[in-house]
Amino acid sequence: MDKKLESLTAGMRIPYGGNNVAIVSEKLASEFESGDRLIVIQTTGDLLHIPADVWDISFKTVEQAHNAFLELGSVDDDSITKFFKLFADYLSDDERFSAIKDSNDEDVKIARSKGRSTTRLILSEKMRTDMVAGLRLWENTPSQRGSAIEEINHDGWNVKLITAGLGAVGFIFEGRPNVFADATGVLRSGNTVVFRIGSDALLTANAIVEHALNPALEESGLPIGSVSLINSAERSAGYAMFSDQRLALAVARGSGPAVAQLGSVAKQTGIPVSLHGTGGAWLVGSSNSDPGMFKAVVYHSLDRKVCNTLNTCCITKEAASVLVPEFLAALSEAAEVRGANAKLHITESADPFIPNAWRGTVSIERAEGEVVETQTEEIKIEEIGVEWEWENSPEVTLVVVESVAQAITLCNSYSPQFVASMVTEDDAEFEAFFDGINAPFVGNGCLLYTSDAADESRG
């Protein structure tokens, strides 16, 4: 007979990984109550506590998304197009947006009082414009639902490979309001979405749901639950959602350790996962780089802090005397346009190319406020992949390398292997870079800003 876990005691030994045990702490034992759930990460022994009320919220929300998916197959593409149009229209409406902005201002106020980063939390006019543009893009994207992408013909019969939705896609995002445009993109390919947003942005998220999202869903005729927000500030709501087998795909974006933990929850539940926990784009310059183009790429890749903002720049030694000044000028201009000072991290190899003007102290904007720091600091080679979570002061790492081949090796060893770009006018050099780099997004003369949901939405 199955028995329920009713309580935990301090010192209790919980098996994991086949031959290991985790020990229940006094804190966990005192907080765990009858009806709660315990998830044991089989690779690390982490004990994750899900209170009963949080589990219920997640269960019911995923159920809505799952049921909506079952209904979505009978909804025509015009209704989905209408949803994107209305959602964009409502975000563009100043009266509706005013209520959303009030909630966002409150979120920002609370986050700042806690010393939390607000870089991605502030719902600026630019973020609003980008959200609307993202929704317009989905509005005008042709549907691929039911399209035959391959056909094999035989005598008297044939077989077709036809695109179809996966199901309910679960997203967990950090606290940034613009994820709505990212997450809802999965509707275009016939999927539904259920997501949890970081607690810092929960007031904003609920305001968007009330004033723009739900009205667009209702008026377009999409099933209730096609886009569902797990309305809980508890981190454990993410554990609950990613342990629900009704999800067809789990997508997590945020800090490295937290995302890895969420990924483990989904994987041991049997849910396919797409994870991105550490960001930062890498850029490589060589003697074949056009200096003006190189400067432009650096400058435009520091217009905001997102997961694929320029984070680490590698310049070959033979090109350093030309490209490092261009790099520093672009970094200065990117900071100046924001009314801030830039922060630079360098390896020992880059030190000879840094002028004295960059070696003083400046005011750097941090989550806790302005802090006076040395503008240029030397770091170890093992630290060049650290993602700098900057506020308003652009922050990057500069490495001078012996060759492009060394830059490729460093990128494959220390980067998050997410976005890599090179500026070169030599086709053979770029081909070697492309072949050697292990990253899903690789470019020449650009850094790739991509939607979090772009790949998943193809479903």
Give the positions of each predicted feature.
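Conserved small-residue-rich beta-alpha loop and adjacent elements
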Residues: 133, 137-216, 220, 248, ...
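Conserved glycine-rich beta-strand-loop-beta hairpin in the small C-terminal domain of fold type I
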Residues: 388-395, 414-418, 440-441
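N-terminal Rossmann-like NAD(P)+-binding subdomain of aldehyde/semialdehyde dehydrogenases
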Residues: 1-160
